[in-house]
Every structure is written in C-alpha cells, then in structure tokens.
Amino acid sequence: MSEPKEPSPALACAAQDGSGLPEGWLQVQSMDLDAQGVARRADGKVVFIDGALPSEWVSASTYRKKNHWEQANLTAIHRESAQRVRPGCPHFGLHAGACGGCKMQHLHMGGQVAVKQRVLEDNLWHLGRVKPAMVLRPIEGPAWGYRYRARLSVRHVIKKGVVLVGFHERKSRYVADMAQCPVLPPHAAALLMPLRSLIAALDAHDSCPQIELACGDSVTALVLRHLQPLSVGDHARLRAFAAEHGVQWWLQPRGPDTVQPLDEGGEQLSYALPDFGITMPFKPTDFTQVNPHINRVLVARALRLLAVRPDERVIDWFCGLGNFTLPLATQARAVLGVEGNAALVARARANHGLNQALAQNHRVLAATDFVACNLFAMTPGMLLGHGAADKWLVDPPREGALALVKALADIEQSRRGAQGATALPAGAEDWVPPRRIVYVSCNPATLARDAALLVHLAGYQCAAAGMVNMFPHTAHVESIAVFERG
C-alpha cells in the first residue's frame, strides 16, 4: 500500500463534497457495522472498502459487484485519517492469514466509539423512526486485555505439521496462525502457544476442534471439545498442563449439556459486582458478559437509569444467572427474574440463596423469585400472568424481545380500544404497564425494531439511549436505552 500523500490546496477544495477527485479515487464518508469504509462513485454506486476509514481519500480494487453496490479492497491511501493508528496486534490487518477476531484496531478508540454511537442512532431512526430525547455518555473501559470469554478454534495442519489454536482468519474458515492476542487477559493470552504444544501431544490431537476460555475473577477454565474419547495418557497430559498453568479443564464430548470438569473439587468460577456486594458463581458454558469491567459499569448505569425505589416491584426479563436481578434485589421491594433456560433459573436461585446468606443486615436482598418461561413465545395472557411491575429491565440476546414488547403493545392497544386489537382476558383492564423500561441490547437492529413497538404502539417515549463499548476493536455494538410512559 502506498504512503499517504498531502493533497494540494486546490484538490482539497475540489474534494470537500467528494467531487473533483482524480479518476479512481474515492472519498470515504462513513464506516458500516462490518468496519468497512463507505464511499460513493460518481454515478452514485456505493462502495464498501475493507480497511478504509471515514474522511480518507483512497484507491480500491473491486472484488464483488452488484447493481447498486460493490465491495473492494483498499489499495492506496492518498489522504490518511487523523484517527488512523498503528494496530496493537501483529496478527491484525488485511494481509493473507490475518486474524479475524478484531476489525477496528486501525481506528483510534474515540473513532470506534463514535462509529458505534452513529450506528445505534441510525438504526433507531431509520429502522424504528425513534429518536432518543437524550444521548447517553458512552460506557468505556480498557481497550486491551478485556476479553474474559473466547471460543478458540483448533486445527491440526498436517501439511505444516503444526496445531493452530486461535480465532479464524479474516473472512475464512481457516484458523489464524497467532502467537499472541492482546484483547485477551495477559494470563490467558500466554496460554496460546502452550496449548498448541499440548494439543499436538494428545493422542486425540485430530479430534479436538475447539477450546472455550472462561475467566472468572480468580479462576480460569478451559473447555475442551473432543470428538472421540480421551485416553488415560491424554487425561494425564491435561492434568499436568492444568498444574503448570493454573487452569481448570472441563471436557465436552458432545453437546453443551455434556460439559463436566475433568476433576471435581476445584474452586468455582465467579465474578463480583462490588458496588452491590454481589458474588456471581457460574459455569464455563453459562452466558456471562465478555468484558467484566464494562459489565460492572453497565449494571450500575442500568440501575441508576431505572431509579428503583424501595416500595417498587421490578421484573428482569431474560435474567440469566441474575446479573441484574440480584443488584435490583438490593434496592426494590420485590424482584422477579424471568429466563427461558430452566438450568439457568436453577442457578440464579442458587446465586440468590448464596448472596442472601452472605448479606449483611444492611443489605438483605428483597423478596426475589425466578421462573422459567419461553420469552420468544410470550402472549398478552402470559404477560398478564406475571403480574404488574413498576419497572422492567430487559436484556435479551441478539434476537431481541419482539414477543415480549409485542405482548405489551397488544395490551395497550386493546386498552385504548384500537381497531383490530387483540381481545384480552377478563381483568386485564386493571393491569398497569411499567412506568419505565431499561433495555440492554447487543443488536442495534432488533433494539430499533422493539423500540418502534414501544414508542409507536405501546405508549412509551425513548427518554435516552447510548452505546456501551463492551467489545473494543470489534464491530459489535452493545447499547442501553430508556423508555418511559408518555
């Protein structure tokens, strides 16, 4: 790639609106969710350029053409963005074999946050016709060493005579040849090369496709997916590795429900929410947030925005292990956690019991219950069955909370007597919708869809929204939004 060149003053003036650039040059206007620079040709066709940043003037080579858009590889930068920085990892880039785990290391962190905030606001407006009354300050944290969970692929490359352990190559099914990873905690990143040697030494080295990493505050667990039984010798090698590197091994011979520790009796994985005096034990395959620092800030921010009073009842939808439920129980009169996975419900109850037992007199947890319910099949009748609550906390997976918010909207439409509204069970007219909803999202598109239902059909206003930089250097957008009754 050529070195950036300073344009002449005349060229700079001519190109302020993207016109007048030399033939073949493109002015990058923005960045999309796949971290591609977005430009337009003179005929209006959109060009998505790998590796290009907003405000840059570039040349690019097209590798995919459609009627209204193209995808292209960056070939030269003629004017470089002031926010272009040197990547922090030698495995990041556009070169062959580059790791695909990160997409934005070449963009200054302030630029990454700005791109994600714009993506959030654009999705809310263009997909949902929703404009927040206030944009929240972004939640930010460490740029490196933040990723406490990772799914590492394993591949025995026979032609090279090596075992690779890491993320997939950029736009490829192959495993990147990576010796380090600065987004992992240092103690976890230091395991990459020893893991390669370990897997190569196993009798089952050809049948171990994946290692899942899960770090707690003081324990690191590794889940080995193996497609054939491990030999006695393999068990011994795993134990020796665990002793040398201070990790726990868990084995997964089939599906997720088959995961078991190699040896019983080890210290339990857990993380703390110190602002609330909460300790959260978890299993390595349980869903927990990738970034523990951001999670602590996010929980505190969500509860401040919800502003729960001691006389209020709160429902935490998609509650998981109780990441929000238990902190809510330090503030509310009563809390209900609703989760689709019955096993998680059982562990959430156990976590509540543990923290209740550890609670000091000034921090006894509120009356708290957990129930299992398929939240993707929610109906107005089911929603009414959970009872009224003053406030809701909603933290769905990427699919969003469509059935839940649609049930709420259907109830509101029926109460208003809207034409074609769903008929509700007797007594529904006495049900009171929540005054405030705090919605934590990991997908801005489904957030926008659900926000549209809440605002346009359920009688809410979007009081605030902002991005949460849970995944620095990646294109993933976490966000938080507040909805209040109009």
From Swiss-Prot:
Its EC number is 2.1.1.190. GO terms for biological process: rRNA base methylation. S-adenosyl-L-methionine binds at Q289, F318, N323, E339, N374, D395. The active site is at C442. InterPro entries: 23S_rRNA_MeTrfase_RlmD, MeTrfase_TrmA_CS, NA-bd_OB-fold, SAM-dependent_MTases_sf, U5_MeTrfase_fam. Residues 14-76 form the TRAM domain. Pfam families: tRNA_U5-meth_tr (PF05958). One of its GO terms (molecular function) is rRNA (uridine-C5-)-methyltransferase activity. It catalyses: uridine(1939) in 23S rRNA + S-adenosyl-L-methionine = 5-methyluridine(1939) in 23S rRNA + S-adenosyl-L-homocysteine + H(+). It comes from the Bacteria. Keywords: 4Fe-4S, Iron, Iron-sulfur, Metal-binding, Methyltransferase, rRNA processing, S-adenosyl-L-methionine, Transferase. [4Fe-4S] cluster binds at C89, C99, C102, C181. Belongs to the class I-like SAM-binding methyltransferase superfamily. RNA M5U methyltransferase family. RlmD subfamily. Catalyzes the formation of 5-methyl-uridine at position 1939 (m5U1939) in 23S rRNA. This is 23S rRNA (uracil(1939)-C(5))-methyltransferase RlmD. The gene is rlmD.
